[in-house]
Structure formats: C-alpha cells, structure tokens
Amino acid sequence: MRVTIRDVKVICCAPQKINLVTVKVETSEPGLYGVGCATFAHRHLAVVAAVEKYLKPYLIGRDVSDIEDIWQSIKGMSYWRNGPVLNNALSGVDMALWDIKGKMAGMPLYDLLGGKCRTGVPCYTHAEGTTIEDCVQKVGALKERGYRCIRAQVGGYGGKDMPYQPPEGSFEGCYYDPKAYMAKTIQLFERLRETYGWELELCHDVHERLRPSDAVIFAKDMEKFRLFFLEDCLSPEQSGWFKQIRQHCTTPLAMGELFNNPNEWLNLITEREIDYIRIHLSQIGGITPARKLIALCDAFGIRTAWHGPIDLTPIGHAVNIHLDMASPNFGIQEWADTNTLSEDAGAIALHQIF
C-alpha cells in the first residue's frame, strides 16, 4: 500500500516562555500521522516559515517511505544549506517520517534502528548555584534523588550569572572576568570532591566562554578532579585548538551542541580530539543524519551524549532516548529534569513513557 503525505502542519507553543516547534505530517491513510521536533527556540518563526513556505509544497504527495531521498532532496534544494533554520525545519519532517514508519511497522524507533543495546539510559542533570555552597547542596539533593552523574556550575553556563566586580572607573554594562570564573570553578570542584569524594561523576560546561589559550590552561587545571567530561571549552569557530588541549591533559572532552554539519565534527572525531559528541539532534537535521554520525563515532571510539536541554520538545527528548537505546557507543544522556506546571486528568507520567 502506497501512503503519501497529505498535509504538513506546524505547531508552536511556549511553556515557561520557551519557544518550541513541532511538525506534524499527515498522510493519505486516515488517522496515520507523525510528529517531529523542529525547535530552534531563538528563531522559531524562521523555522515555521521554512516549513510552511518551502518544505510543505515539495512534500505534498511524496511517499512517506522515502525518508532518505526526501532528506537529501530538501538538504540540497535551497542550494545554500547547513544552517540552523533549514536543519531544524528538516528535522521536524524527518522525525515525523520516522514516526510514521514506526507506526506502519508496529515497531518503536529503537527497533527500526536495529534493536536495543541496553534496557535503560543513564542520565545526568544540572546543579547550578549562586554560590559554591549553594551548588554543593544542590548536588547533594540530586545525589539523594539517585543521580550518579551531575553537571555542576556556579552562576549557570560558564559562570554567566556569577557575581562579578566591574573594573574600577568602568562604564555601566556587562563585564565578564574569565580568570575569576576559572578560579571560582576550581574552588567549586575542590569542595565537591572534598564533600562527596569520588563516588559521584561530575561534569562542567564552559559554554564557550573562554579564549582558546585560557581553555588549554583550564582543562589542565581541571584534570585533577577526574571529570566525566568537560563540555564546550571552545567555540565551534576555534575547534582547531582541541589538539592543543588534548596534548596537555587527559580530561575527557565533550563538544557539539552548536554543530550544524559534518564539516564541524569530522576532524574532531577522526583525529580523536574529543571523547563525547554532544550535538542537538534537530540542529543537524534529525534522525537520518544522527544515524550516520553514531556509526562514524563508533568507528573512532567516540561516545554519544546528545544535547537534552529545556528548549527541546518532549518529542526531541524521546528521540534522544530511542537513539541511546539503539547505539552501541552510547555514553550518557543529558536530562534537564522536569517541571510539571499542570497535569491533565488521566495523563501518563513521564517516567512511564520512557
């Protein structure tokens, strides 16, 4: 039976003022549809326009089974490609088509991808404090909840909200002191190891807020804390510096949430300059390219740690989990935890879904 695409719709919502975008692909078979995550929270309206004005006219009438051909055609049809707007729009369609394929086959996504490699998915979450002691206490609370790997920060990502002292005589504005951030972070991890010993796995996210030369020093200084990984210590534009970091320390390195295309990750993987790939699935175009990235990483001993932030739809989180289940080189899954604002009668608890 040939099943074709009948309609493509975009659904936008903004829980807690976070712009989330979902694509719904409806088919010629009554009641058969698929959904996919297309969330680019900072430019969501551009993604909506890309789906409605450009992808939808092309997709109507296409066979839902031709996932690879549809993905390749959309990727190249705009000529200028590999940007976050088109990739997120493409992701919404791609995930929806995989969803349809799974429903037609009567199989979950992880079975379509080759079957389960594990029965559960280890996750890490975030502890962010305004002070060192605040963060230490939050790590303890998460430990009590059962987390065995925790990302710790003072002042949020890369210390962006950390108290600072503006330079004397400076103009009003925002100042960031990388040296103060580095020193405060080292103090934090000294306290964490002093308090919890080596029973916890710990991570840290620099969030690209260091100059390359400072990142080399910082990664070396963090080596003694035996991190599970140090995340995004460089911006994608400066990824050539990973070679210097690798030469100076053994701290495991994670990178990738801002990556859009293979040219950004290829050398890091084939040269084994990172340990974990951290891409945001919708940012690279969905499940179809993620499968290929998993296989590439597996060949070079790199493990996955997909980006799992709050600005991701539940569909995106579910896809992360399915890929984790089916990947032999799965490492760990970021989980931004849940914040239930309301619950409808009869709603299924999130832990029951996963």
Task: Annotate the PLM regions.
Residues 120-248:
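Metal-dependent enolase-superfamily TIM-barrel catalytic cores that perform enediolate-based chemistry
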Residues 1-16, 103, 107-120:
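N-terminal amphipathic alpha-helix/helix-capping segment at the start of soluble metabolic enzymes
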Residues 96-105, 136, 140-144:
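Alpha-helical scaffold segments that flank or form the walls of functional sites
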Residues 28, 32-104:
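Metal- or metallocofactor-binding catalytic centers and their adjacent structured scaffolds
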Residues 1-40, 338-345:
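Structured beta-strand/loop patches that form or line metal/cofactor-binding pockets in enzymes
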Residues 5, 31, 55, 93, ...:
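Conserved, mostly hydrophobic/aromatic
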Residues 108, 122, 201, 252, ...:
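Proline-centered loop/turn at the N-terminus of a beta-strand
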Residues 25, 53, 69, 220, ...:
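Shared catalytic-loop signature of beta/alpha-barrel
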